[in-house]
Amino acid sequence: MQDKRTVKVGTVADTAVGGRTKSLGVEVTDSVNSFGARNRVKVGDKSYQIYRLDAVPNTEKLPYSLKVLAENLLRNEDGSNITKDHIEAIANWDPKAGASIEIQYTPARVVMQDFTGVPCIVDLATMREAIADLGGNPEKVNPLAPADLVIDHSVIADLFGTADAFERNVEIEYQRNGERYQFLRWLQGAFSDFKVVPPRRIVHQVNIEYLARVVMERVGVAYPDTCVGTDSHTTMVNGLGVLGWGVGGIEAEAAMLGQPVSMLIPRVVGFKLTGEDPAPGAATDVVLTVTEICAKHGVVGKFVEFYGEGVAEVPLANRATLGNMSPEFGSTAAIFPIDQETIDYLKFTGRNAEQVALVETYAKEQGLWHDPAHEPAFSEYLELDLSQVVPSIAGPKRPQDRIALSQAKSVFREQIPSYVGDGDGQQGYSKLDEVVDETFPASDPGAPSNGHADDLPAVQSAAAHANGRPSNPVTVRSDELGEFVLDHGAVVIAAVTSCTNTSNPEVMLGAALLARQRVEKGLASKPWVKTTMAPGSQVVHDYYDKAGLWPYLEKLGFYLVGYGCTTCIGNSGPLPEEISKAINDNDLSVTAVLSGNRNFEGRINPDVKMNYPASPPLVVAYALAGTMTRLEKQPLGKDKDGNDVYLKDICRSQKTLGHHPIGDNSEWFTKNYADVFKGEQAWRNLPTPTRNTFEWSPDSTYVRKPPYFEGMPAEPEPVADISSARVVALLGDSVTTDHISPAGSIKPGTPAAQYLDDARRGPQGLQLFGCRRGNHEVMIRGTFANIRLRNLLHDDVAGGYTRDFTQDGGPQAFIYDAAQNYAAQNIPLVVLGGKEYGSGSSRDWAAKGTRLLGVRAVIAESFERIHRSNLIGMGVIPLQFPDGKSAKDLGLDGTEVFDITGIEELNKGKTPKTVHVKASKNGSDAAEFDAVVRIDTPGEADYYRNGGILQYVLRNMLKSG
């Protein structure tokens, strides 16, 4: 069949890099231009080609976010996957309609973090070898959309509270991750248009401070900057007016290789902002309030767009924080339009004058500049008066569960009974002398070893003020930390962490000013609190240093532990051994306070049950308090005149931050990003291959060459019907991608663990499936291996088990072992599912592992959209039971032999609407039905005919010469 699509594989320039010539992948195709939208705009002395939105009637009525999508379709119209009808559909968008019209979105660039990015790069490296095996040039495999990978997920706060914590944590980081880092260092030199930012930054902070352009320019064409990323918090860039969100690895790879991302035109929730921020340092409080409002309203799968006169009152850093939290309240994106604040931020962060001028001119020319007086039509409406926002935290297990700080003590007392055992008493002071209550006010100094004051009481206690709540005081003795009493509600982690807040100078300086004021009063953190500081950019370190604030933070124990995600993603590191033992031996329900974005149970630290996102100043305050019961209305201390100082006074004093040390000096950013891709000496010292294909190590348990292209011919073979297939899994409703491909711990005794044991995994241990995503051998064995998965082929058996019908009687077996036996006998596999199959995160290995097990088809009642697309991207056909029917309704129990006919219609250039399924079982009549083929677009049909999206792209690269 003749492929109707224009494939973006042209190269217009070559450059020598490291002694090797590399072709620069550049999009050189042109739009069909059905609306005559192609035009030019002049900015200074330069002229740019643009695609005018006003050439399409009704686009002026659209919300900002949909205007960006409309331009994307207009510029990428190819007459097949993106047609005039698609453009008109978005131009004539009905705000009240549901999300039902599918479009193909072509992001301008891709951003990745190392945890999810490694398997994507493994695929690209494998493609290079495959194209060489087929007689092509390996260097043809290069991103066609610019891609950046930032290493931020690997650093762990193992060491803390000391001046050398950062250096020691970096050393441990390289010991743990040397194998992966060597692979990424090779990538840095081997690919064009793909850059790697070595450790010491967080991807989303780098994105807003450096990578994002707001308006892109490629080959003389100017267009809105858009992106997809392999991390859900990619939405942080929405604060700059850049439309972007998190996707799975398969979609990210497709986008890098010039393929569009399938999506539905969404509903758009207009969020009107009025009033002024209550204080410059209140960004986190605003974010938690917006998160609460959106989660209660219901914004899942929708765009949230901020508008109104209050938008101008929201600083760009605060906008970025709001965008960052989009996944927490469920929206696909949470975007601000472009305005003067955007321009000022671009200047502030050191973007060049030519780029800034292009952004302003383009936005105004295209109707993308925010007009506070104009109210676009939205699907739904929300509103917030910023002046009504109050200091807040959230928790203990969901970021949308906001708690006003004034109510934190009472709410905690309501929550704690559900987190403690039945044996814990309600009268906490029955075990302590009542006088303790007066002995330990909130401003008590702490122990000296972890940034604590020198004058400490005999025994400090987290059980003080425990009256009226469950209490289980436990005395802890430590050579380093002294003697103290732990109890339920003790704050054992206080972490200034995450790009969510560390990208915001006002809240970061607010935390440091609070530290300075408390240290000057002789106050200190409690000895049981693990205090860590992990910013997302070295800019933070530099302005702290310039302002002379580091000594005060360090006096409270907030030493630099690393630049990276750390505590926010669960890399909090272990608690001191004595504290961890006391918690676990006595089943204490302790807490963490962090300036991060997620607080799900078990996420932050295995010893901590209750987690509370808060602003950086509140993190410092809770480190001083040491317990969740101390901050309601008690003073943090007294000023020089002997007056009580309350937390609210600290917050209001931040109005002086208008001229904070960072000022308006863009040199902070130009200096720190001048060598952003160079890395520190440890990075540069990594042994790095110089070949254009990767030198795979046969001993590696982290990075291995996957088998996707083994035996692949230059031309696709005809697709075939499925005969004599067996069911490897019969599943119920709401099976998530985490059920299919877990990211958590590798359970001893399972096929994945056995493989690693046989491979002599080394001192790192089994670790997590998430750490091993670059090794297909581990990930195949982990597919359908979630310990909570219930395969209905068995009664009352959970985990990665099935029945192996290659053996007499179909005995119980691990799914991986049974799949190997089926493969040995050339028996294809199918999976039967219920409603919402593949829901949850867009995890690429849920589709990759399914295909590599030998599954040819998944038949379900309904699919989550991204997973359905990912299955096709891996050559697995998604089929849907007849409307209203389920496997149970059709009498299927998973013991049948399946024949699926009609798939071969795809060889004739058309996609069948249904295929015929016959399920035969000995001793009974066959069940027969017509299943709906969920290949929904011409592009998906092309991918399936080729055996997957990577095979499709590879073959087109070969054809392009």
Swiss-Prot record:
GO terms for biological process: tricarboxylic acid cycle. Its cofactor is [4Fe-4S] cluster. Pfam families: Aconitase, Aconitase_C. Binds 1 [4Fe-4S] cluster per subunit. Its EC number is 4.2.1.3, 4.2.1.99. It catalyses: citrate = D-threo-isocitrate; (2S,3R)-3-hydroxybutane-1,2,3-tricarboxylate = 2-methyl-cis-aconitate + H2O. [4Fe-4S] cluster binds at residues 499, 565, 568. The keyword Cell membrane does not apply. It is an enzyme of class 4 (lyase). InterPro entries: AcnA_IRP_Swivel (IPR044137), Acnase/IPM_dHydase_lsu_aba_1/3 (IPR015931), Acoase/IPM_deHydtase_lsu_aba (IPR001030), Aconitase/3IPM_dehydase_swvl (IPR015928), Aconitase/IRP2 (IPR006249), Aconitase_4Fe-4S_BS (IPR018136), Aconitase_4Fe-4S_dom (IPR036008), AconitaseA/IPMdHydase_ssu_swvl (IPR000573). Keywords: 4Fe-4S, Iron, Iron-sulfur, Lyase, Metal-binding, RNA-binding, Tricarboxylic acid cycle. Pathway: Carbohydrate metabolism; tricarboxylic acid cycle; isocitrate from oxaloacetate: step 2/2; Organic acid metabolism; propanoate degradation. GO terms for molecular function: 2-methylisocitrate dehydratase activity; 4 iron, 4 sulfur cluster binding; aconitate hydratase activity; metal ion binding; mRNA 3'-UTR binding; mRNA binding. Monomer. Belongs to the aconitase/IPM isomerase family. NCBIfam families: PRK09277.1 (NF006757), PRK12881.1 (NF009520). This is Aconitate hydratase A. It comes from Mycobacterium avium.
